[in-house]
């Protein structure tokens, strides 16, 4: 079977990448930008780094900031109405996954108005038209939403997150500039970085993995393992490594899928507003152990990429343990909690387990879980 790979038309990487935004806008004949960015980025003048460039070149824009950390159906609906009134012809998404996901949903609904209820786009979205052109400017090194065909929206009423997968939503241009990530506090750097590591490890071991996505994901594991500690301390080398590593795994997992770490984490975000990266980081080692017998020798590769020495001489049991231990050590070093005791209420475990079973990421897991197994995984983390 042929493997499909979908990537940005164009991407810019490295310090100063955002300086190419105005040139790209002019080359494409765009007239007015709908700048989608969350309130904190506006408050701390991160968004201003981009709007100053637009101002300098006399390019029009309008800012939309009704975005929550876990974007909701309401955020999307109000964004669609704001875009219609703005007269904009492209979107500049500035931020982490929240801004990117909101932008994708808005852009898709604008060009596919028959799907005005974003819930109708869950799973493999049946759209026919490419979304409003998006320029993506990530400010976190984690979600890689600037290069993926996925977006996640929270249904507050039903207390669940749902994943939409649509080749029509990928940003046309990504500007991956580590300078845009330098204002991230340590905690956010750690959680988004562990989100990226989860993408890479799940992507490398998912059922849909192939030789191309493996190349992206394995190199991403190596870069993230080398760079995250430095990024948390805000070193230039660490920021640069994370910017590239998280983008590489975006190129990978977007084209092969994820697994039950994300299925379980989505429920925590919807029910408790738990930061997505924190939820992933806590769950990842336990799910790696659960999946260990279903992924062949891939955990040997993971252990080596994580920096473990002597993996070629290790027994199967040794390299599996080494891979899990290396992930646990990195998570501990960057300050991630070890368990879900302070997050999950015992009475919610059944609901969370069923949510994970219903999640779009679950079928890609290398081992097919039953409800009781998911429940046991949650309980083991409490």
Question: What is the predicted function of each stretch?
Answer:
Residues 150-256:
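Carboxylate- and glycine-rich phosphate/diphosphate-binding segment that chelates Mg2+/Mn2+
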Residues 18-21, 43-46, 73-76, 99-103, ...:
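Short glycine/serine/threonine-rich phosphate/pyrophosphate-binding segments
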Residues 74-179:
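Glycine/threonine-rich beta-strand-loop-alpha-helix active-site module
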Residues 267-306:
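Catalytic phosphate/nucleotide-handling subdomain of diverse soluble enzymes
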Residues 42-115, 229-239:
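N-terminal small/polar loop signature for handling phosphorylated ligands or for N-terminal nucleophile
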Residues 1-64:
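An N-terminal, well-structured beta->alpha segment
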């Amino acid at each position: 079977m042929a493997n499909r790979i979908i990537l940005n038309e164009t991407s810019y990487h490295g310090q100063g990448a955002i300086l190419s935004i105005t040139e790209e806008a002019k080359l494409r004949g765009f007239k007015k930008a709908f700048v989608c960015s969350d309130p904190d980025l506006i408050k701390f003048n991160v968004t201003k780094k981009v709007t100053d460039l637009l101002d300098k070149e006399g390019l029009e824009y309008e800012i939309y900031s009704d975005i929550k950390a876990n974007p909701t159906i309401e955020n999307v609906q109000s964004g669609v109405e704001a875009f219609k009134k703005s007269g904009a012809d492209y979107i500049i998404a500035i931020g982490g996954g929240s801004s990117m996901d909101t932008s994708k949903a808005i852009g898709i609904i604008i060009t596919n108005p028959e799907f005005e209820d974003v819930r109708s786009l869950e799973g493999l979205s049946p759209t026919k038209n490419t979304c409003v052109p998006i320029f993506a400017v990530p400010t976190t090194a984690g979600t890689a939403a600037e290069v993926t065909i996925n977006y996640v929206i929270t249904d507050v009423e039903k207390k669940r997150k749902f994943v939409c997968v649509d080749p029509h939503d990928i940003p046309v241009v990504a500007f991956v500039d580590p300078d845009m990530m330098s204002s991230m506090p340590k905690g956010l750097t750690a959680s988004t970085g562990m989100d990226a590591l989860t993408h890479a490890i799940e992507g490398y071991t998912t059922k849909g993995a192939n030789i191309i996505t493996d190349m992206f994901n394995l190199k991403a594991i190596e870069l993230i393992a080398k760079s995250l500690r430095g990024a948390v301390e805000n070193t230039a080398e660490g920021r640069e490594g994370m910017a590239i590593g998280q983008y590489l795994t975006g190129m990978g997992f977007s084209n092969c899928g994820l697994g039950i770490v994300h299925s379980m984490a989505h429920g925590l975000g919807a029910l408790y507003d738990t930061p997505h990266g924190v939820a992933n980081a806590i769950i990842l080692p336990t799910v790696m152990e659960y999946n260990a017998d279903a992924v062949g020798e891939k955990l040997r590769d993971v252990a080596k990429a994580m920096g473990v020495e002597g993996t070629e001489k290790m027994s199967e049991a040794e390299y599996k343990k080494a891979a899990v231990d290396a992930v646990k050590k990195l998570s501990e070093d960057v300050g991630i909690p070890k368990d879900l005791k302070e997050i999950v209420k015992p009475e919610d475990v059944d609901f969370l387990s069923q949510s994970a079973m219903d999640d779009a990421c679950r079928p890609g897991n290398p081992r097919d879980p039953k409800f009781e197994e998911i429940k046991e995984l949650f309980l083991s983390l409490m």
